Amino acid sequence: MRNAIFIAGTDTDVGKTVASKAILQALATHNIATIGYKPVAAGSDKTEFGYRNSDALHLMKAATVDMPYEDVNPYALVLPTSPHIAAKHENVTIDYALLSNKLSKHKQNAELVVVEGAGGWRVPTSDSDCLSTWVKQERLPVILVVGIKLGCLSHAILTAEAIRADGLELVGWIANRINPGTEHYAEIIEHLEGRLGTPKLGEIPYMPKAKRQELGKFIQLDHLLEPDTVA
């Protein structure tokens, strides 16, 4: 079984946290020790404990291993914008070595670490780099979350191509229905099943306040739990 997976999205607000939480909840039913890891988050609220990102808090709640917030979300940037813009406004440099150190710590404490990305695959972390550089460095297998809406076919196919062009394994994809009114839903799913060339791990239906729901039942874990054969 893989010891870490990266959850990528076709865009921002397509359901990476919903899918990550669903995976964590499904793994919990198999008594697998898990940690949710949100290396970089943009959009955090001030609390008595410091700035906290709501997506990172959802991951903490769904995981089975307790870790300090600072380990789960090393960069809780305040502004809800692209990480490189938020970091620049806060005089922060996103250090990949720090992200790797936290990931190594998580791997020592859990059987599987679910690493949630930010934005889309090429989300910038500085004026000259993207978070995907760090994912490549760590050789993380990737699950792609597709927010089912008009335009998602091109976004999904392009993102899958970019992930593979970076030399990474696309181990599966998850459909997240973000708009109940999307027409031709079944045809969109059928096309993605034929084009992405990797197993569909689940379909998450539209539901209000999805992040607060029990989502594990929508995920099929068989492929995810197979032995890791990629060097």
Curated annotation (Swiss-Prot):
Pathway: Cofactor biosynthesis; biotin biosynthesis; biotin from 7,8-diaminononanoate: step 1/2. GO terms for biological process: biotin biosynthetic process. The keyword Cell inner membrane does not apply. SUPFAM superfamilies: P-loop containing nucleoside triphosphate hydrolases. The active site is at K38. Keywords: ATP-binding, Biotin biosynthesis, Cytoplasm, Ligase, Magnesium, Metal-binding, Nucleotide-binding. It comes from the Bacteria. It catalyses: (7R,8S)-7,8-diammoniononanoate + CO2 + ATP = (4R,5S)-dethiobiotin + ADP + phosphate + 3 H(+). Its EC number is 6.3.3.3. PANTHER family: DETHIOBIOTIN SYNTHETASE. Homodimer. Belongs to the dethiobiotin synthetase family. Catalyzes a mechanistically unusual reaction, the ATP-dependent insertion of CO2 between the N7 and N8 nitrogen atoms of 7,8-diaminopelargonic acid (DAPA, also called 7,8-diammoniononanoate) to form a ureido ring. This is ATP-dependent dethiobiotin synthetase BioD. It comes from Vibrio cholerae serotype O1 (strain ATCC 39315 / El Tor Inaba N16961).
